[in-house]
Amino acid sequence: MKKKQKQHFTGKKWIAALVVVVLILAAIYYYIALPAINIHNPELWKFVLFLAVIIFALYALPKTTFTGDRRHPVNFSGNYKTKTFKFLASLVVVIAAAYFVGTLLSSPVINASKYQKLMKIEKSEFTKDIDQISYDQIPLLDKSSAEILGERKMGSLVDLASQFEVADEYSQINYKNNPVRVTPLRYADLVKWFTNKKAGIPAYIKIDMATQQTELVRLKEGMKYTPYDHFGRYLYRHLRFKYPTYMFDDINFEINEEGTPYWVCSVKKYNIGLFGGQTIGRVVLCNAITGECKDYKVEDTPKWVDRVYSADMLVNLYNYYGTLKHGFINSILGQKDCLTTTNGYNYLAINDDVWVYTGVTSITSDQSNVGFVLMNQRTMETKYYEIEGAIEDSAMTSAEGKVQNLGYKATFPLLLNIDAEPTYFMALKDASGLVKKYAMVNVHNYQIVATGDTVNDCEASYRSLIQSNGMGSDEESKKASTKTTAGTIKKIAQAVID
């Protein structure tokens, strides 16, 4: 009988098999993790380093061959001294070193001046920019209250409640000149996705933050591209395959003036080194129904889009501006002239744009504000107002103290202009999250506090208080007294830190 020939697993075959295994692992990782193929993407560097380590480890392991029923080691004649081994070892070291150096050279430690100049600040006047308008445009709810209304609305819809849930987006937007929150529905679970994927998500919820009217908007054609879908319809995968080099920031759910749902996908831009100085470079609008995407420069973004820059990004950029004036070391040790934002923010609607409001306080003395800033979420335009007064937390405590016998809790305040006086306005909620009263607190003097069961009652009481304290503008008060209905204060888009 002819003796069976032994099949040796040669070095070339081992390398070929190694390449195939690595490519398969890389494809699986890419499909699941969806890293942007961009030199500025830290996740891509980690991915490449991981692959290099895997290749090196597999190559360095002892190789074997299978011959019949016996296993014999293959002699690679000094494998660990080969050029391939040395190259792979060097590759791992070089990638790791490049990532470390790139991270260091991108940090505020070395680039404090560049970070401090990322945001341009314009000084302005409060009464000039913040006009007074009617109450019907003032939101009376915060996000948590909107969530309660959304859940109640969903619970009343028998035909949908068993298949869908309310997503937790609740994006704050201006819709036809009114402050509203919008959020899509989502599949209750994976099984519900399989049974409903053909039709898609049939509706979204819209809540008027001024009137508290909650509406389920049914769509003629369902949404098929969302973060709640799977496989090719999973929103992030859909975007990644269309834009493989784009690094997306937070994705926001909005509707255009016709009520069509879109995903506003801001594209990160790194301005300092490889990984530092993040702002926004472009905006991709993805139609949630059709999946059609359009790519815009930030300055060309359609006017109906309200959020290009997230509030957190704008706050971080201002903190760089306020703390790094005299370098990084001063921001940690001496802290001379260091200013920082307070621990909350809110949204104001001005000229159909949404602006982020937050107070500004000294790092060394954070019990009062030295001013506040407004930051445009669509353009990053930033205005600073030098107004000393109470921080928001103090105003909230004062308002709660006014009704301490009832145990109500204040929402994060809105900033209003009443009789040329900067004023904190907030809702007072009971333990179940329902709004029971409203409060106004003077920014300059947080001991001046007015409450009321309605906004009109609260405002009337507040006007009386500031006038009795010799504050406010007589001219503005006379204008207000001629109105027989709603009072006049600045249109604000209510929000709390998400």
Give each language-model segment a name.
Residues 2-498:
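Soluble extracytoplasmic regions of secretory-pathway and membrane proteins
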